[in-house]
């Protein structure tokens, strides 16, 4: 996208926890082991689709932010295989989830209303 390497994932609804689950890992070798993406993997942005009928939208996270939040590893240290995303319409009660929602929603564009959604999308891209 515009000369940048983007990774796309669709977040999954889980029945017992609020928010949606986004798997974000790679299989670097034929060994079968999985690992978090790393800052040096050449990914500029991660786009995650979140849907909860009738609402939907996308999170657009820059690589540097995912490193800062310890979701991407740096020099193969740290990182996560998956994490929860909290769209603006989700109301988590746990303090950690509320903190995550704050930084995540700064990178979210709701596309339910296309006119307004496209303007939001232009901001987060």
Regions found by a protein language model. Give the residues of each.
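Short, well-structured hydrophobic secondary-structure segments
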Residues: 1-41
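Short, flexible loop/turn elements at secondary-structure junctions
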Residues: 3, 12, 28, 52, ...
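Structured, beta-strand-rich domain cores
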Residues: 30-69, 73
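Helix-rich interaction surfaces within compact, conserved domain-sized segments
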Residues: 69-116
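Intrinsically disordered, low-complexity terminal/linker regions enriched in Pro/Ser/Gly
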Residues: 113-125
């Amino acid at each position: 996208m515009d000369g940048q390497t983007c990774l796309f994932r669709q977040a999954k609804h889980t029945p017992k926890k609020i928010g949606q689950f986004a798997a974000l890992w790679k299989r670097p070798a034929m060994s079968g082991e999985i690992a978090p993406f790393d800052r040096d993997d050449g990914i500029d942005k991660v786009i995650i689709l979140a849907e909860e009928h009738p609402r939907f939208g996308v999170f657009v996270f820059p690589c540097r932010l995912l490193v800062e939040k310890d979701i991407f590893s740096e020099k193969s240290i740290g990182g996560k295989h998956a994490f929860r995303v909290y769209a603006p319409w989700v109301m988590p009660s746990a303090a950690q989830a509320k903190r995550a929602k704050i930084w995540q929603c700064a990178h979210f564009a709701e596309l339910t209303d296309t006119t307004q959604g496209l303007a939001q999308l232009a901001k987060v891209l």
